[in-house]
Amino acid sequence: MDFSSEEAFRAGAAELMDNCLSIGLNTVIAQVRPFGDALYRSTLFPWSHLCTGVQGQDPGFDPLDVLITEAHSRGLSLEAWVNPYRLRSSAKMPPALAENNLANVHPEWVCAVGEGLYLNPAIPEAADYVVQGVAELVQNYAVDGIHFDDYFYPTTDAALDAAQFAASGAGDLAAWRRQNVTALVKAAHDAVKAADTTLRFGVSPQGNPDNDLGQQYSDVKAWLAAEGENAVVDYLCPQIYWGCGYTLQSGSTRFAFENIVPEWLAMPRAASTALYFGLGAYRIGEGDGGANEDSQSQWCTGSALARQVERLHSLGAGGWALYRYDSLFRSARPELADAERAALAALTTA
């Protein structure tokens, strides 16, 4: 997207929305807080460096407002995508943090993992701040929902939150960490519903449920089953970025598309909670790295995504999402992307 002016950004947003409509999509999930920052006017977080190249620098217009206007004028929903804990993924991303980035304002809330900086999920004040950010979004913008990515705990290292764990008196570190994450997700859900009960709140966890439970400490099975006043999410959209027949080096095919989707669908789920599936558009032409012989070739057919969508329909899935836009509309393999788009459109716009 071109952030050089509101006019340029609006033109890009209009093209983006038209493109999404052309393949039958009904919702755009737009990243608005990738690094403890904001692609919108916020009193809590600095402007994202993605707008101007410098975190904290005002681009002179409100990108989120433009995206909402362009989406809604075409009948598309728009959800605001938030990374709740991440402040920095590497020394160069973002290249420099604004003075009012939480890493500078509240360093006691922040933990370093490699070159990355993250809010410590065990610190309630940090979680409360994230929830305040969610409330700010739904109170100030006509978004249709809030979407959390899969990044929760940045490491399994017990040293990360050892002091908080010791002070808690809890006996099981993994269970305690899952409680911390669930408390944040539940509070974010409730903040969304407090603003408007018709708004959606969802999470896109990793496609491997074991990783969710034991590495990210996201209790996805409990979230799916919770209902009523205990509801935690309106939907989950696990990232199923593997093809059919996907095989690990061990020979396991658990994560092959045709196996892992039914595994998720078999999980007990509250009637009010939807289950969608994220599909890996970025795999087009690249492959998924599986040990199976067709781990790349099946992603070079021009219809890989459409075949997965057909399979999801036959299994009764609630919906699907594509990651990510550029892979279909700004691809380095335009002929292959064109074919994938045409195959999707034939399914969704017929």
PLM features per residue range, with description:
Residues 23-59:
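Aromatic-lined carbohydrate-binding/catalytic grooves of carbohydrate-active enzymes
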Residues 1-7, 44-61, 113-131, 170-181, ...:
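The substrate-binding groove and active-site-proximal loops of carbohydrate-active enzymes
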Residues 1-10, 68-69, 79-140:
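Active-site-adjacent "subsite" loops/lids of carbohydrate-active enzymes
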Residues 226-258, 263-350:
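Substrate-binding cleft of secreted/luminal carbohydrate-active enzymes
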Residues 40-53, 86-114, 150-170, 292-297:
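Aromatic- and acidic-residue-enriched segments that line the glycan-binding/catalytic groove
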Residues 4-23, 50-74, 129, 179-186, ...:
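Aromatic- and glycine-enriched glycan-recognition loops and surfaces
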Residues 72, 77-89, 147-154, 174-216, ...:
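Aromatic-lined carbohydrate-recognition surfaces of secreted/lumenal glycan-active proteins
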Residues 11-38, 140-145, 227-236, 312-320:
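Catalytic domains of carbohydrate-active enzymes, especially glycoside hydrolases
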